[in-house]
């Protein structure tokens, strides 16, 4: 009985956004600005999904994967912020639009929480890395290598909870948009500004939801990410492609139990680059136990010296990747805050002048 209920629920969710997707396709045909947005969005989303599909066989995320996801969220936020500012005069005059923009910014706060969790994990990695490079003498370095190897995973349960929160907030945003559109009268639906604004925010939110779903599947159900990456974008607007991707995603995910909740219950993000370093350390640890009985004599052992130097060299490369990812996360967080500040300030100015 439970399976039947679950199946009906999933079949229903697949039809939830059909009307909105068709409306988006129609708007895309009539508005050059939406067409331009659509082209950029389709290329960006396709690139992110393909990047996430890399390495799914080991259920891990590389730095390139995380950077691609962050970059896509950054770009989409910039696109939406630009449209909101371009339409500001019409937005301030219409309560429905105004509330919709507020909801969009509410969603962006959840995204900031996710980036804060990501930054905390990256900072933990950097601290352990610095201890190793600053180790004076082999005895101290060996101790720090062991501490690094035994350290807690940088992306813990908090990271997954924040990610789940971002996903849930994007879903909430889509549902809110759907309810708003159902309440609007026909005259408002024909207003060009509202159509452009709602179409672009809807598609940006839906694309983010799909990307988050594929990111989750990369860890919990690797074959889903691979299947979606192999899907060829159809000719036409992104609405058709996103609709197709979403249906494929739901079909692939059927029969699996609570994919997204399993992400942070007994599962963790295995950053591939970090695991490679830890594997090297483990191998070196085995060699050291066999060759070194007294840490004070480590300086005389050539193989140990070479092994430690090799790890330090790889750690330098790893450090650069961590720093680049942290910079990108900072950029996205700063951009979201800046867009919120600018738009909220203009809301205040518009209110004062009326």
From Swiss-Prot:
One of its GO terms (cellular component) is membrane. Disulfide bonds: none annotated. It is a multi-pass membrane protein. Keywords: Coiled coil, Membrane, Transmembrane, Transmembrane helix. Pfam families: DUF677. The chain crosses the membrane at residues 200-220, 222-242. It is found in: Membrane. Its main location: membrane. InterPro entries: DUF677. Residues 270-341 form a coiled coil. Belongs to the UPF0496 family. This is UPF0496 protein At4g34330. It comes from Arabidopsis thaliana (Mouse-ear cress).
